[in-house]
Amino acid sequence: MKWTEVTVSTSNEAVEAVANILMEAGASGVKIDDALDYQNLKPDRYGEIIDLATIPHVTSGAKISAYYPETVFVPEVIPTIKQRVSQLTDFGLNPAPNEVSMTALSDEDWATAWKKYYHPVRVTRYLTIVPSWEQYQPVQSGELVLRLDPGQAFGTGTHPTTKLCLQALETVINGGEHLIDVGTGSGVLSIAAKAMGVGAVEAYDLDDVAVASAQTNLDLNPVAKDVHVAANDLLAGIDTQADIIVANILAEIIIPLVPQARQNLKRGGYFIASGIIDDKFQVVMTTIKEAGFQITQHTQMGDWHGIVAYLPTAED
């Protein structure tokens, strides 16, 4: 089979949104080459095991390559891709330079093209994300290994917003909690939460493709075999009392989620949010505070912010 590689040059902040657009246009998989990821993966960070000198990568911005089968007439979908990427400015994301190129590939090229960019990566003190096809053994006591298939979009755990959420989860999980993952994408946060000892996990995403991607990754991790994953619009129609709610989604979507999170969170519980770019941080923080939460932690990685908010008990 012949394949077509479509590559979009964009900004670091627009990476995951662009990847999602490419998947929705019919891609069978994506490859993300983000300069910011490599800046955050210096050899001395968390004992990183990647030798950057051996990996070809961009030094600024990002390139997302998507792979389309011959059943997709790519010249017809490229204008739509360009238009949708340009419209990301409506969500506070700058997708520039938004340059699109197209290359014909053989089946063999497609099968291996993106794998050279994906290696075991230590993303927190205790978590290492490993591609599904690689053999890997923990190198330190207490290390938790998560396996992901990066052939789908929705993140591989190395994006700054995902790291912020993972680091936050390490600070609030004690074991046995009930957690809700809103906008689960790849399912990486749900898998990590189970590995850290959470009891029950509900994972939701509006996109059916994301739900399928998450289920694929859940199946790769026996610890997450009982995670409930389903399509849903944020927490609309959900009526539960969770100990932790985590959302790695854009700020514009976090804002309407806040009252839903407040309704579905136990007193004494935590709301973790990331996906918040610099110029949206203050409005998100204000919205969370006005809903009755206390901000207990604010973290930042590059232009991205993470928030941990606590819902006080009557005794607090």
UniProtKB/Swiss-Prot annotation:
Binding site for S-adenosyl-L-methionine: T162, G183, D205, N248
Localization per record: Cytoplasm
Gene Ontology biological process terms from the UniProt entry: methylation
Enzyme nomenclature, EC number: 2.1.1.-
A GO molecular-function descriptor: protein-lysine N-methyltransferase activity
Alphabetic keyword roster: Cytoplasm, Methyltransferase, S-adenosyl-L-methionine, Transferase
Classification via Pfam families: PrmA (PF06325)
Catalytic activity: L-lysyl-[protein] + 3 S-adenosyl-L-methionine = N(6),N(6),N(6)-trimethyl-L-lysyl-[protein] + 3 S-adenosyl-L-homocysteine + 3 H(+)
Claim: Hydrolase is one of the keywords in the record: no
Main location class: cytoplasm
GO CC annotations on file: cytoplasm
Key word S-adenosyl-L-methionine present: yes
Entry function: Methylates ribosomal protein L11.
Recorded family membership: Belongs to the methyltransferase superfamily. PrmA family.
HAMAP family: Methyltr_PrmA (MF_00735)
Protein name: Ribosomal protein L11 methyltransferase
Organism, as annotated: Lactiplantibacillus plantarum (strain ATCC BAA-793 / NCIMB 8826 / WCFS1) (Lactobacillus plantarum)
Top-level taxonomy: Bacteria, Bacillati, Bacillota, Bacilli, Lactobacillales
